[in-house]
């Protein structure tokens, strides 16, 4: 099974996982939607400046776990989370935590590009404005430009930043959403199948961007594409029926997994 390119294998091997500190720690995380239990005592830690891919069949709990990391599940009626998740030393589910501030520190990029019905500039400047990150118009201009550069979009839109963001192509809209996320200086970026609505060329640009973003951010990505998980991540976690099956270095997961369920899923025997 040769799911990893040679470059990806080298990338994974060169990344010294054992020496990388944890950015987020999940301990005994369970999620309930009303009476239905969706996650069962998941213990999963996210390493700093690392791309962690969450894989598994539809309905396995990977997106549910992802949304726990910045409490997006709070927006779902009847959802209840137990266990503990920490961001550095901060308890994500502490009753006194500022959830708005948490979601600035742990940003989110969704499956379908969802730019605001505003200009490109306003899409990126909105977060810094409400969080008071810019002291002047010049500061705000610089944040917008830097964020668009980090999202690999600046050169494509620098002459039309005051045009609507909804007029961009799908791939450009998704990179605009990434720029919007990084504009508030997050520590972690969550991505829920960010390429599922994109064509192969746009997908390749987003994957290249993920590699670049890892230098400054911790990234957790949910993906149904085994090839994508192999290409972009250093760590991979396999979910099945609400349970964490295993988590390991990506090269090991795709060449010599510990659990036969992981092997069967990667080989396409179920999904």
Swiss-Prot record:
SMART domains: AAA. It is found in: Cell inner membrane. Its main location: membrane. The keyword Lipoprotein does not apply. Keywords: ATP-binding, Cell inner membrane, Cell membrane, Membrane, Nucleotide-binding, Phosphate transport, Translocase, Transport. ATP binds at residues 56-63. The complex is composed of two ATP-binding proteins (PstB), two transmembrane proteins (PstC and PstA) and a solute-binding protein (PstS). This is Phosphate import ATP-binding protein PstB 1. It comes from Rhizobium johnstonii (strain DSM 114642 / LMG 32736 / 3841).
